[in-house]
Amino acid sequence: MAGKTLYSKLWDIHEVARRDDGSSLIYIDRHILHEVTSPQAFEGLRLAGRPLWRVNANIATPDHNVPTTKAERQGSLLSIADTVSRLQVQTLDENCDDFGIFEFKMNDVRQGIVHVIGPEQGATLPGMTVVCGDSHTSTHGAFGALAHGIGTSEVEHVLATQCLVTQKMKNMQVRVEGTLPWGVTAKDIVLALIGKIGTAGGNGYAVEFSGSTIRALSMEGRMTICNMAIEAGARVGMVAVDEKTIQYVHGRPFAPKGSDWDAAVAFWRGLVSDPDAHFDRVVELSAEEIKPQVTWGTSPEMVSAVDQSVPDPERETDPVKKESLIRALKYMGLQPNDPITSIKLDRVFIGSCTNSRIEDLRAAAEVVKGRKVASTVKQAMVVPGSGLVKAQAEVEGLDKIFIEAGFEWREPGCSMCLAMNPDKLGSGEHCASTSNRNFEGRQGIGGRTHLVSPAMAAAAAVAGHFVDVREMMR
């Protein structure tokens, strides 16, 4: 009998029943909620008179709409200027209070982005099924968990039944071997992958990231890669459990204690793909060949190494792709064959659920220390992923490094990742962003987003345009 992949093992453990149409009923261990996709779900429960099936399986925090300036974070929710944002945060508070859900409220030091606080609190554990009304829930797969985003109607289903009806996916292995060159990060790995297979390359697959390069990454690096599995078209991204996983989880507030911990660890160590497991697709990358990446277009697959140029649509033989390239270049205000290093920046954003953890901030601070943000850059901001990340950075003095360089040091939240709060781009502005999506209007109407690693964003802030961070730090 053939061995099983990690995904298949987790699926089998959580499959409650198989239905005649081929779908399955899957049990959900952890449900994380935020203010945007939960209001209608709670209202549905009230209208149907349904209680929560398992209250303590849920945790919540506001993140998408919360302002990130101190002025709007002091005092009550009335300090939130935007009425819609204020209503959504207030509604989450009321729903969590009414249904008894543990919430890290806006001014709780533990508040932060859902995909930062889940692992940080130990609410995300190996072997779990984890869902959230947010597509980047794949982040939690870095812990050997089966994690994916769900829609608002599914949020209600999980609250009411702790189960979901879903289809099993195919298995894809992304194997990355070798040692990453200095200055090349997990963000560059996943952008290079998306550039190779495209944003549809992972459609219908659960992706397991493996190989010596992945094993060498920290847990925070693994979270970055799993976070953007969705940009490669996959609903699920995951990494097998190893000692790094176990050490990261140990001692965190929601993690098991005592004999429960010992039993959990014994189980977790088996959460790896068997040596003879079959994958439906295998993609291989060589770490040594990966360079710092920069997106130049309006899709994550429109990406090049920093020492390359914007492509020329005239060289594209596929008419559909050619038209897509022409539209992207027009929107981005770029010309064919422009060097990536010629792209000038108006704003720089270091944050988001992709790259706002302490290691990300350390990497950026290392670049800007003793330097200044270029006078041509209108705004450079650092938005920690949680209050605890912010506090740790301040203990290490990272906030002072950023402020002295000319960065704004903000409160935690999703911030400029998406135009759903006060942090937005103006039309036509170019932004070096450590977030995960560069669609038209993602960071503001007419805004032009370039996805990069924290170190590359920091270097761009100093230079005023894209540069190879390896050259700057040489």
From Swiss-Prot:
Superkingdom of source? Bacteria
Q: What is its EC number?
A: 4.2.1.33
> Which residues make up the binding site for [4Fe-4S] cluster?
C353, C414, C417
The cofactors it requires, by name, are: [4Fe-4S] cluster
Q: How is the cofactor bound?
A: Binds 1 [4Fe-4S] cluster per subunit.
For this protein, the record's InterPro entries field holds: 3-IsopropMal_deHydase_lsu, Acnase/IPM_dHydase_lsu_aba_1/3, Acoase/IPM_deHydtase_lsu_aba, Aconitase_4Fe-4S_BS, Aconitase_4Fe-4S_dom, IPM_dehydratase_rel_enz, IPMI_cat
Q: Pfam families, from UniProt?
A: Aconitase
What pathway is it annotated to? Answer: Amino-acid biosynthesis; L-leucine biosynthesis; L-leucine from 3-methyl-2-oxobutanoate: step 2/4
List the molecular function annotations (GO) for this entry. Answer: 3-isopropylmalate dehydratase activity; 4 iron, 4 sulfur cluster binding; metal ion binding
Does the record bear Iron in its keywords?
yes
* Catalytic activity as recorded in UniProt: (2R,3S)-3-isopropylmalate = (2S)-2-isopropylmalate
Q: Where is the signal peptide?
A: none
A GO term (biological process) for this protein? Answer: L-leucine biosynthetic process
Transmembrane region(s): none
User: Which terms are listed as keywords in the entry?
Assistant: 4Fe-4S, Amino-acid biosynthesis, Branched-chain amino acid biosynthesis, Iron, Iron-sulfur, Leucine biosynthesis, Lyase, Metal-binding
The question of whether Iron-sulfur is a record keyword is answered with: yes
Q: How does this protein assemble?
A: Heterodimer of LeuC and LeuD.
Task: State the protein's purpose.
Answer: Catalyzes the isomerization between 2-isopropylmalate and 3-isopropylmalate, via the formation of 2-isopropylmaleate.
List the HAMAP family hit by this protein, alphabetically: LeuC_type1 (MF_01026)
Give the family this protein belongs to, as stated in its UniProt record. Belongs to the aconitase/IPM isomerase family. LeuC type 1 subfamily.
NCBIfam families named in the record:
leuC, PRK05478.1, PRK12466.1
Q: What is this protein called?
A: 3-isopropylmalate dehydratase large subunit
The organism encoding this protein is Xylella fastidiosa (strain 9a5c)
